[in-house]
């Protein structure tokens, strides 16, 4: 018997001995078997059970949603002192044999590295499920008219008729440039992968009865 009722001191001791040679309750990755023992314990064990404490911290480091998605089969009823996991029989030993005073640092390092790699793999899998971030830019355009007789309101209306996938027009204002002439400053937000700022400038300049030139006054990544 590997371990029995983990809510009893004896069962906890047996679980500690089991986890001295095993990283997980079943197999080489966390599963519902680990979750059933984790839930049965209810709280972190004392530091005296060093192997159980290490395993408990590792399982607790996963979010509840991640633990719920683990595969495998939960262990049967844990109470009653009945065995939950089978293990190869070991010869009886004195209590002193349960404590390895000269444990291998290499084994501990390998275990820590393996757990680290598993965490990295789990994080990468979680991250891959998140939607990709969309690169956007905020652009301030200076749209200059031919002269002071240009209908600036009509010019702005024409500019705002331009529609492109990934283009969103923002606030605008008229800025004096001299001799009674105003230029139109208009803000827009573009998705970098969808909107070419050069093409947008060309489309604005197509309103040649109103627009003399278009310049980029400011360009910032969002």
Curated annotation (Swiss-Prot):
Keyword Phosphoprotein tagged: yes
Organism: Drosophila melanogaster
Biological processes annotated in GO: translational elongation
UniProt keyword Protein biosynthesis present: yes
Recorded GO CC terms: cytosol; eukaryotic translation elongation factor 1 complex
Biological role: EF-1-beta and EF-1-delta stimulate the exchange of GDP bound to EF-1-alpha to GTP.
Membership in a protein family: Belongs to the EF-1-beta/EF-1-delta family.
Protein origin, superkingdom: Eukaryota
Name of the molecule in the record: Probable elongation factor 1-beta
Keyword line: Elongation factor, Phosphoprotein, Protein biosynthesis
Compositional bias (Acidic residues): 94-111
Post-translational modification: Phosphorylation affects the GDP/GTP exchange rate.
InterPro entries assigned: Arc1-like_N, eEF-1beta-like_sf, EF-1_beta_acid_region_euk, EF1B_bsu/dsu, EF1B_bsu/dsu_GNE, Glutathione-S-Trfase_C_sf, Transl_elong_EF1B/ribsomal_bS6, Transl_elong_EF1B_B/D_CS
Region: Disordered, residue numbers: 90-111
Signal peptide region: none
Subunit (UniProt): EF-1 is composed of 4 subunits: alpha, beta, beta' and gamma.
